[in-house]
Amino acid sequence: MKKTTLLVILDGWGYSDSDYFNAIKNANTPTWDSIWQEFPKTLINASSLEVGLPRSQMGNSEVGHVNIGCGRVVYQELTKIDKAIEEKTFGDNKAICAAIDNAIKNDSNLHLIGLLSPGGVHSHEEHIFEMIKIAKQKGIKRLYLHAFLDGRDTPPRSAEKSIKKADKLLQDLNLGYIASVCGRYYAMDRDNRWDRVEKAYNAIVNANADFIYDSALEALEQSYARDQSDEFVIPTCIKKDGHLVKVQDNDSVIFMNFRADRAREISHAFTDESFDHFPRKKHLNINFTTLTEYDSKLKCAVAFPPEQPINTLGEVLMKNHKTQLRIAETEKYPHVTFFFNGGREEQFEGEDRILIPSPKVATYDLQPEMSAPEVTDKLVAAINSGKYDCIVCNYANSDMVGHTGNYEAAMQAIEYLDKCIARLKDAILEHDGNMFITADHGNADMMVNPETQKPHTAHTTNLVPFIYVGHKKAQVALEHGKLSDIAPTLLNVMGIAQPKEMTGKTIFNFEK
């Protein structure tokens, strides 16, 4: 029987001494409290420069899992795109130039779609504004912005400022206008809720929506009047001078999100010839360009293609003939597979994967336990089987329930996770294995913004825990660690040499 090394990633579980609406600190967590007292622990960085993001930028699930799995600081798309804009090479990008040239050659429209937000998690509005300026410089006559609204990585009702900026820029350049708005709940689903994606797609492509208004600001105001915050704005079309905008053959569409997981579904609706998740009027003959690669199967141009890192944790385990398991529920499954493997879709030899479906509820505060019971059942069975040298799992609760802004539900989620951790601890210790518990970023550690006294639905920049649970004696060797130090630590406890590509350092020293 193999002695399993288990990495538990508690998504959105940040550390804060403050008890002000801190769902993690204020929840009843007897198992967590005892582990925190009994076993070696430290706090590590999961945001900003330490994970390859701009200074003070909060971390996120994609970035976190890439850094953990690669064992090095991986500079993120946000940083790369910011650099291209700063160095004035953004407008020279071949894919972007081809999309603009297509619209000019065909005297057709250029559509920009994406999350209009300063959040910096899935997109950044400054990238959209820069693209608008470049389009004007290169001779585009008609540009239409289809704005997805955030309210999740930003305050729930904060889109007005972004819409006003976009409106002013388009007006100043006499270039076009915001042609549709919708909450990211619809356009950026990642859990096969195609009914939501269909509403967003129809508003963008067919100008078919439940609501039509004269301006994006009016659409936002009316949405607030219906008590729908930014994230949940029902797809709405904007009518200017009696004209509704549709996406037509020979148009160019540039998707301005840089993060893949929530951009895939609607991209497939635009590009797949045999798409069958909902009816489309026709398969459009358009130039579809994405800022980064969302899915290798998508038929589209990519402005900033991925760089595939070598010797990630998964690859090193394979080369050392170790068996590994990745497990998560739907919401975080891409993170423990695709992102953890540095953007690689294919499984490594000896790598098994278990996907547990996320519950079909409108928002996860309605079911704070999500699919944690099923994830835990599978994990305990895998540990007991003695089949795996290394298991990587993700619990989505503290992030996904944290994003709802529901403090009571977030505490319930944390308390349920505490029960799950108790089961994992018992199984690991019984089989003389090793368990590491960490997080990819913070979230549920601040459920209300202390400055505004309003719900805080975004991630935090707080440090995250890193705990060792096992029978080995361990000492903290690195006081100021970061996510990229986790993989080297796992290799250390497993007795596997760290490859030179992994620049992280081991956080704990283990007695031989």
Curated annotation (Swiss-Prot):
Co-factor requirement: Mn(2+)
Reaction it catalyzes: (2R)-2-phosphoglycerate = (2R)-3-phosphoglycerate
A Pfam family it matches: iPGM_N
Active-site residues from the entry: 61
Keyword terms of this UniProt record: Glycolysis, Isomerase, Manganese, Metal-binding
Transmembrane segments: none
Domain of life from the UniProt record: Bacteria
Listed InterPro entries: Alkaline_phosphatase_core_sf (IPR017850), BPG-indep_PGM_N (IPR011258), Metalloenzyme (IPR006124), PGAM_B_sf (IPR036646), Pgm_bpd_ind (IPR005995)
Amino acids binding substrate: 122, 152-153, 184, 190, 259-262, 332
GO biological process, any: glucose catabolic process
Binding-site positions, Mn(2+) 1: 399, 403, 459
GO cellular component: cytosol
Residue numbers binding Mn(2+) 2: 11, 61, 440-441
Pathway(s) per entry: Carbohydrate degradation; glycolysis; pyruvate from D-glyceraldehyde 3-phosphate: step 3/5
HAMAP family linked to this entry: GpmI
Purpose of the protein: Catalyzes the interconversion of 2-phosphoglycerate and 3-phosphoglycerate.
Subunit structure: Monomer.
Name of protein: 2,3-bisphosphoglycerate-independent phosphoglycerate mutase
The organism of origin for this protein: Francisella tularensis subsp. tularensis (strain SCHU S4 / Schu 4)
Native organism taxonomy: Bacteria, Pseudomonadati, Pseudomonadota, Gammaproteobacteria, Thiotrichales
